[in-house]
């Protein structure tokens, strides 16, 4: 469960290491984001020669949360940390690699590219 001011790890090779959520997209009263939701983030920690710089603002999709996601069969998939993948204005991933597992909930038309790049889909 991600809200404004939440810090997330970055699960791609854009050069960003940590981002902070500045807005949950999808309605003016929307407070929380879960796996598969798009958020607006700012880069807080970046690698020296990365594609992105500290202070820049991007869209991102949440790929892992410590809160987890409940499946239809009653199982719960959760992770040790919160992570996101940075997106451009067209909601396409900026990076060319994804690190760590992602969930099946991302298998929508919008995020199939992320699922195909991920090393493991849970």
From Swiss-Prot:
GO terms for cellular component: cytosolic large ribosomal subunit. GO terms for biological process: translation. SUPFAM superfamilies: Ribosomal protein L14 (SSF50193). It holds the Pfam family Ribosomal_L14. InterPro entries: Ribosomal_uL14 (IPR000218), Ribosomal_uL14_bac-type (IPR005745), Ribosomal_uL14_CS (IPR019972), Ribosomal_uL14_sf (IPR036853). One of its GO terms (molecular function) is large ribosomal subunit rRNA binding. Keywords: Ribonucleoprotein, Ribosomal protein, RNA-binding, rRNA-binding. It comes from the Bacteria. Signal peptide: none annotated. Part of the 50S ribosomal subunit. Forms a cluster with proteins L3 and L19. In the 70S ribosome, L14 and L19 interact and together make contacts with the 16S rRNA in bridges B5 and B8. Belongs to the universal ribosomal protein uL14 family. Binds to 23S rRNA. Forms part of two intersubunit bridges in the 70S ribosome. This is Large ribosomal subunit protein uL14. It comes from Herminiimonas arsenicoxydans.
